[in-house]
Amino acid sequence: MAVCLPDTQDDTPSIPIKLTRVGVTGVKKLLQLERNNKRPIILVPTFDAFVDLPNDQKGVHMSRNPEAISEVLDEVANDSSVEVETLCAKIVSKMMSKHEYAKRVEISMTTDYMFMKESPVTKNKTQEMAKLKAKAVGYREDGEIKIRKSIGAEVIGMTVCPCAQESVKESDKNKLLEFLDEETTQKVLDTVTFASHNQRGVGTLLIEVPEDREVKGEDIIEIIEESMSSPVCELLKRPDENATVLNAHKKPVFVEDCVRNMMEKIAKKYADFPEDTIITSRQENHESIHRHNAFAEKVTTMGELKEELRI
């Protein structure tokens, strides 16, 4: 005879306080995304899954979260059209049906993503890694379930400090004027690339995706890379290294500039997205001459962003 085990999660808590997010973090899965006439993409994503909890319930049914993730992954195993943000939306829908007491459900996914690129001069092909991110949030409103999904990426690049570069330039100008006239000195200043301290920049960009639209992860990665002083590359021969350093120092940017660059580029590329589309841009630069890092962030809607940019 089977033993009937108690379900203590449904008990009334001694302290009647509702909780914003309860769930599981760090759920790792193997995900194979089929592609028409191409090799499948193999990912090992990490999922975080949460629901809110009403004040009259002691706990959530925790096992239902990884259960929902596993069930959806099995369902999409042979689907060549599914995108990672749509996958997250499907998991949210599944969790909504399993947690009937929840008014809000959230799932986020992060995975390493490999993409190919060429070194700038020798054109050697190299495998590069970025973090691909996806998220979906579901709400119960007026008896209906509404789900909003997002896709994004986190990419490493290189940034060069404009302030230090101008200081070096001014210092070198004064030295040149000791033995050159002003006209010749100016020609040198216009020709030579000046030194500065640089950083390993980590750019993050996320955008909500409407139901009838698609945003490619590769496009997000490209926007992030182009918003810094220079992309970085795993394989650089001497000519590539020279070009990377020179190109970066010809495009110095503050951490604030990186965020603004990302926002401007994504607003122009997806200007026809709904006005309430939420966009998040974040940049953290690992300083070379300080022990601390520099950080900047903007969270906005497409409508607010277009109004600021007047587009």
From Swiss-Prot:
Enzyme nomenclature, EC number: 3.5.4.39
Keyword Ligase: no
Pathway: Cofactor biosynthesis; 5,6,7,8-tetrahydromethanopterin biosynthesis
Keywords (A to Z) from UniProt: Hydrolase, Iron, Metal-binding
Pfam families given in the database record: GCHY-1
GO BP term, pick one: tetrahydromethanopterin biosynthetic process
InterPro entries: GTP_cyclohydrolase_FolE2/MptA, GTP_cyclohydrolase_MptA
Gene Ontology MF term list: GTP cyclohydrolase I activity; GTP cyclohydrolase IV activity; iron ion binding
Subunit organization: Homodimer.
Biological role: Converts GTP to 7,8-dihydro-D-neopterin 2',3'-cyclic phosphate, the first intermediate in the biosynthesis of coenzyme methanopterin.
Name used for this protein in its record: GTP cyclohydrolase MptA
Organism in which the protein naturally occurs: Methanobrevibacter smithii (strain ATCC 35061 / DSM 861 / OCM 144 / PS)
Gene (name only): mptA
